[in-house]
């Protein structure tokens, strides 16, 4: 059970330049445009740019005054940090923006509405009704001063800010980000205390958040977009994280996600009641295939950008459902348990739980933190999402876009609580 705590007021001494910016910001209210400040400080503070070409920002002091004077009623706060950091602590009333890395290019091209990357339905509606009427303030972890450089990759914070302003919103970024605001005004920050959180007390990291990601304009196959340790690799080229769970991870009561080692451990298979094994590799043997105790299915796919894994989604989903109907556990594995088997597992959750790609991916990642499907597989999952009709209604796509998989049947959709209690 999570309890929301508000920290005691904490004040930190500001630098001379920071104090000047805050002082200039003090008289600038929500909705003011760049340069709207008064006196000698105009053009420096929260409602103004910090120089030619700089993006418009608001100060921590300005935000504190808005929250205390109006309770944030005239403000729409957007937190662009990873979801785990948002869950750990965030500014009151903020909405978190979380998105799989594959969607960043779509965001850059302008065909991904911002509303569609807000996971919570109530927050979607709040964004839709207030984004044009309120001052929109975005923040990341610690951006202090930001001036775009010509030709440099746009940060996601900058991309969102520019898109909002192009759409007619009064949008700004928070100078100094969350770190500065929490240091100076912790009473306006909400912290979730959860006994199951990181034992070290440090916030976990995520590959899904927007804050530190950058978007390249190249047309690479996506392999370079995977940020994994380089100390080890799969036999067919996929990086393998240095630390992995010792046993398969339970995704649903009957569905387990693991690696090749798990599939050869009789003690593990027996412990979890696993009788069905889905092997998502072209060359790893089915260790106990001839013993008659286990039911196998093998999907001959390598972890490579050229492979079409999505054509096997229907039969993989059917195989998992067969195990479920017989009240048996099913293990989905590849070599390392981070790419191919994850892709199949996410596809299953999307169809059977009626989850969007973003929600299904997040669901799996919360159970197994080291997942990293290759970029092409994520693209296939995105196409699968469209076929299932799970995309946001405001996320329109050109009719000429190609789908790269056999269309699965869209039936037998189960609510989350039904599947998790089975």
From Swiss-Prot:
It comes from Mus musculus. One of its GO terms (cellular component) is cytosol. Disulfide bonds: none annotated. Interacts with MAPK1/ERK2; the interaction enhances DUSP7 phosphatase activity. Pfam families: DSPc (PF00782), Rhodanese (PF00581). PROSITE patterns: RHODANESE_3 (PS50206), TYR_PHOSPHATASE_2 (PS50056), TYR_PHOSPHATASE_DUAL (PS50054). This is Dual specificity protein phosphatase 7. Belongs to the protein-tyrosine phosphatase family. Non-receptor class dual specificity subfamily.
């Amino acid at each position: 059970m999570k309890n929301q705590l508000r920290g005691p007021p904490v004040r930190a001494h500001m630098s001379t330049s920071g104090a000047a910016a805050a002082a200039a910001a003090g008289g600038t209210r929500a909705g003011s445009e760049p340069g709207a400040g008064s006196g000698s400080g105009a053009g420096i503070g929260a409602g103004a740019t910090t120089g030619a070409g700089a993006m418009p920002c608001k100060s921590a002091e300005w935000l504190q005054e808005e929250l205390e004077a109006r309770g944030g009623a005239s403000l729409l706060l957007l937190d662009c940090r990873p979801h785990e950091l948002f869950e750990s602590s965030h500014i009151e009333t903020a909405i978190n923006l979380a998105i799989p890395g594959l969607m960043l290019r779509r965001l850059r091209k302008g065909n991904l509405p911002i509303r569609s990357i807000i996971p919570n339905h109530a927050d979607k509606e709040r964004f839709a009704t207030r984004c044009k009427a309120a001052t929109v303030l975005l923040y990341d972890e610690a951006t202090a001063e930001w001036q775009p450089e010509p030709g440099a990759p746009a940060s996601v914070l900058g991309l969102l800010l520019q898109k909002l302003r192009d759409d007619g919103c009064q949008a700004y970024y928070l100078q100094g980000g969350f770190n500065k605001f929490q240091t100076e005004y912790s009473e306006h920050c909400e912290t979730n205390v959860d006994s199951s959180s990181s034992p070290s007390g440090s916030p976990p990291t995520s590959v899904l958040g927007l804050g530190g990601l950058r978007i390249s304009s190249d047309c690479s196959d996506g392999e370079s977009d995977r940020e994994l340790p380089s100390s080890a690799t799969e036999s067919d080229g996929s990086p393998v994280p240095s630390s992995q769970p010792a046993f398969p991870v339970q995704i649903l009561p009957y569905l387990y996600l693991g690696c090749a080692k798990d599939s050869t451990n009789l003690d593990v298979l027996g412990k979890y009641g696993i009788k069905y094994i889905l092997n998502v590799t072209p060359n790893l043997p089915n260790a106990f295939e001839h013993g008659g105790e286990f039911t196998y299915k093998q999907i001959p796919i390598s972890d490579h950008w050229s492979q079409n894994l999505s054509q096997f989604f229907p039969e993989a989903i059917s195989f998992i459902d067969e195990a479920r109907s017989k009240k048996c556990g099913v293990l989905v594995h590849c070599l390392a348990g981070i790419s191919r088997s994850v892709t199949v597992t996410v596809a299953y959750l999307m169809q059977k739980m009626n989850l969007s790609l973003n929600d299904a991916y997040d669901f799996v990642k919360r159970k197994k933190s080291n997942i990293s499907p290759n970029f092409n597989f994520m693209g296939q999952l995105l196409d699968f999402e469209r076929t299932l009709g799970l995309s946001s209604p405001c996320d329109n796509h050109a009719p000429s876009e190609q789908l790269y998989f056999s269309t699965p049947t869209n039936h037998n959709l189960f609510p989350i609580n039904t599947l998790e209690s089975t």
